C-alpha cells in the first residue's frame, strides 16, 4: 500500500479547462481518509498552489516550480533551489533567435515583459497572473526558473541554442509541448520528492505518482508506482516505456484509477 501520492497538475489532475473535477476532489478526500499523504508536484508557483489548497481546504505538501521549492503542510519551506545569478543573467540578456515569450519566476511571483492574455486561460481556476516588468531589471540572485512559451518547433530550436550557451550549468526540460523551462542543475520533481520523502521518513518505494510531461520523468521513474497519462507527451512514453498508461485528464483518469485501487486493489485495472 502506497503511503504518499504525488500528482502533477496540468494535463494530469486538472481537466483541459484547468479545473479540478468533483470526482477528483472526492477521491483526494478518500486518500486522506486512508492516511495517504498528498503531494502536488507542479511547475506552478507556490503562491498560486497555496491559494488553491486554501480554497479547497486540502492538506497537501507542495513541490512547486518543477522542484525549485518544497513546502510542508503548514507552509514551511523545506527546500529551495535557485538558478545561479550568472545563468539567469545570460538567459535574460542574451538575444535568442526565437519568437517565444520569456517568463521569470521568483518567490514574489511570475514576471514577463508584455501582456499575453491567452496565457492566463490556464489560471482561471486560481486567478493567478503575471506581473509586467522590464525583465532586464530583475534581481538576478533569486530567480527560481525561467520559462519560454511558444510553438514547439521554435522551442526545440531554442533548446539547442540554450544548451550550446549554458552547457551543463542548467537543466532544460519541456513542462508542456509549448513550454520550455530553464531550471537549476539537478532540479526536478523527482529530486524534490526525494527531499520530501526523507523529511517524512519514507522511501520512494512508498510513493505513487502521476504525470504527463517531460518535467515528470524523474518523479515517475523513481517512485514505487508511476503512472503516465493517456494524453502524455510521446517523449515521456518513450522515456518510460515500462510504466502503465492510464486514461485522459479530460475523463479525470487519476480519479478513475485511484477509485479502482482503493476499492479493488487485487484486480487488474483497465483505463476503459
From Swiss-Prot:
Residues that, per the record, bind Mg(2+): 8, 10, 212
Alphabetized SUPFAM superfamilies for the sequence: HAD-like
Catalytic activity of the protein: 4-amino-2-methyl-5-(diphosphooxymethyl)pyrimidine + H2O = 4-amino-2-methyl-5-(phosphooxymethyl)pyrimidine + phosphate + H(+)
One example GO MF annotation: phosphatase activity
Classification via PROSITE patterns: COF_1, COF_2
Taxonomy, superkingdom: Bacteria
Enzyme class, UniProt record, top EC level: hydrolase
Record has Magnesium as a keyword: yes
Keyword Metal-binding: yes
Keyword vocabulary terms for this entry: Hydrolase, Magnesium, Metal-binding
CDD domains named among the record's database cross-references: HAD_Pase
Essential cofactor(s): Mg(2+)
Active site: 8
EC number: 3.6.1.-
Family: Belongs to the HAD-like hydrolase superfamily. Cof family.
The protein's role, per its UniProt record: Catalyzes the hydrolysis of 4-amino-2-methyl-5-hydroxymethylpyrimidine pyrophosphate (HMP-PP) to 4-amino-2-methyl-5-hydroxymethylpyrimidine phosphate (HMP-P).
Protein name: HMP-PP phosphatase
Source organism (scientific name): Escherichia fergusonii (strain ATCC 35469 / DSM 13698 / CCUG 18766 / IAM 14443 / JCM 21226 / LMG 7866 / NBRC 102419 / NCTC 12128 / CDC 0568-73)
Gene from which the chain derives: cof
Amino acid at each position: 500500500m502506497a503511503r504518499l501520492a504525488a500528482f502533477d497538475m496540468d494535463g494530469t489532475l486538472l481537466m483541459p479547462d484547468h479545473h479540478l473535477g468533483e470526482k477528483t476532489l472526492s477521491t483526494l478526500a478518500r486518500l486522506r481518509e486512508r492516511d495517504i499523504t498528498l503531494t502536488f508536484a507542479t511547475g506552478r508557483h507556490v503562491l498560486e498552489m497555496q491559494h488553491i489548497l486554501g480554497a479547497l481546504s486540502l492538506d497537501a505538501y507542495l513541490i512547486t516550480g518543477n522542484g525549485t521549492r518544497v513546502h510542508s503542510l503548514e507552509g514551511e519551506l523545506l527546500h529551495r533551489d535557485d538558478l545561479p545569478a550568472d545563468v539567469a543573467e545570460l538567459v535574460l540578456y542574451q538575444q535568442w533567435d526565437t519568437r517565444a515569450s520569456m517568463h521569470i519566476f521568483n518567490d514574489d511571483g511570475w514576471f514577463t515583459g508584455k501582456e499575453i492574455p491567452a496565457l492566463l486561460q490556464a489560471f482561471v481556476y486560481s486567478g493567478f497572473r503575471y506581473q509586467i516588468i522590464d525583465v532586464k531589471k530583475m534581481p538576478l540572485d533569486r530567480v527560481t526558473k525561467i520559462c519560454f512559451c511558444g510553438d514547439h518547433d521554435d522551442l526545440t530550436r531554442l533548446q539547442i541554442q540554450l544548451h550550446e550557451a549554458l552547457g551543463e550549468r542548467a537543466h532544460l526540460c519541456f513542462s508542456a509541448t509549448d513550454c520550455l523551462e530553464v531550471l537549476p542543475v539537478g532540479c526536478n520533481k523527482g529530486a524534490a520528492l526525494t527531499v520530501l520523502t526523507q523529511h517524512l521518513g519514507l522511501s520512494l518505494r512508498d510513493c505513487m505518482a502521476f504525470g504527463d510531461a517531460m518535467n515528470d520523468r524523474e518523479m515517475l521513474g523513481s517512485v514505487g508506482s508511476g503512472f503516465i497519462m493517456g494524453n502524455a507527451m510521446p517523449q515521456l512514453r518513450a522515456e518510460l516505456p515500462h510504466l502503465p498508461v492510464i486514461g485522459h485528464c479530460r475523463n479525470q483518469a487519476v480519479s478513475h484509477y485511484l477509485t479502482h485501487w482503493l476499492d479493488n486493489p487485487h484486480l487488474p485495472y483497465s483505463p476503459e
